[in-house]
């Protein structure tokens, strides 16, 4: 039995906390919202994010950062990318011993263009860092929490962290593979959110299967181009952390990125769509980061560029689709 602190009480953090508890581990969840903490401790639910799920009664929650830090030597960082650096820094200020960090965020930091493991590494003093890894792949929280068969990848620069992650999470409904390509697994998880928003737009407009298939295929091509430029193994993008995550996020209404895109395709403004969803949509922030990163690295990413124009330059969806279709002739 292992003690694990889960930082973040969103949908995926909650679903994975449930997996860990059912696997026999001691789990403490940390969140800022006292009402959510009280609900979990009293009712064993988190209805804001997982409306109908009844959680393992052994999961406990707290809003006390010091208590959360002292509880365990393994931390599951289940926070939005934009909150990761701040919370990791707060954790670092209170650490007195080495900890292992496993994150499940799928984004690229605005401004620095850093992957989430790099953000954590920046924030945690070396004397307190026992290793950093990621758990990623096609894994909707809504399915994990009701024990639908799910398969994901665990990766780290340190193979022992990947193996630890595999051992902690794997059971008869969650299969975990290890993968040595941390860069590729993190980039696959982050970049597919861009394509998922675009895929939602295509569905919202009412375009057919031809357009959806083309978008995912060409989206994977530009993900691979940038990934290879940044040091990833292109083969990673043909695995769970790449095309696996891409397919599930581009085809399901469980995906908040797809849902945002669908609403935009239906003619809603971004503010209107986000107000209805009341959830963090990583694809917005990732699009901004990757648009500028691709320009800096001189990588051609036409779908990302088009989505950036829709999200941040108020260009119409149909105009961007027209521009994509009328680009110069190219070889695949």
Curated annotation (Swiss-Prot):
Q: Which UniProt keywords apply?
A: Cytoplasm, Lipid biosynthesis, Lipid metabolism, NAD, NADP, Nucleotide-binding, Oxidoreductase, Phospholipid biosynthesis, Phospholipid metabolism
State which Enzyme Commission number(s) the record gives. 1.1.1.94
**Gene3D superfamilies named in the record:** N-(1-d-carboxylethyl)-l-norvaline Dehydrogenase, domain 2, NAD(P)-binding Rossmann-like Domain
User: Gene name on record?
Assistant: gpsA
Biological source species: Staphylococcus aureus (strain NCTC 8325 / PS 47)
Which protein, by its recorded name, is this? Glycerol-3-phosphate dehydrogenase [NAD(P)+]
Outline what the protein does.
Answer: Catalyzes the reduction of the glycolytic intermediate dihydroxyacetone phosphate (DHAP) to sn-glycerol 3-phosphate (G3P), the key precursor for phospholipid synthesis.
One Gene Ontology cellular component term attached to this UniProt record is: cytosol
What's the short name of a Pfam family annotated to this entry? NAD_Gly3P_dh_N
Sites where the protein binds sn-glycerol 3-phosphate? 106, 137, 139, 192, 245, 255-257
Q: Give residues annotated as binding NADPH.
A: 11-12, 32, 106, 141, 256, 280, 282
Look at the named UniProt entry and state the broad enzyme category this protein falls under.
Answer: oxidoreductase
Q: GO molecular function, one example?
A: NAD binding
Q: Name its cellular compartments.
A: Cytoplasm
Q: Does the keyword Disulfide bond apply?
A: no
Which NCBIfam families does the record cross-reference, listed alphabetically? Answer: PRK00094.1-2 (NF000940), PRK00094.1-3 (NF000941), PRK00094.1-4 (NF000942)
Reading the lineage from the top rank, the first entry is Bacteria
Pathway, per record = Membrane lipid metabolism; glycerophospholipid metabolism
What's this protein's family per the entry? Belongs to the NAD-dependent glycerol-3-phosphate dehydrogenase family.
Q: Which GO terms describe its biological process?
A: carbohydrate metabolic process; glycerol-3-phosphate biosynthetic process; glycerol-3-phosphate catabolic process; glycerol-3-phosphate metabolic process; glycerophospholipid metabolic process; phospholipid biosynthetic process
Per its record, the protein catalyses: sn-glycerol 3-phosphate + NAD(+) = dihydroxyacetone phosphate + NADH + H(+); sn-glycerol 3-phosphate + NADP(+) = dihydroxyacetone phosphate + NADPH + H(+)
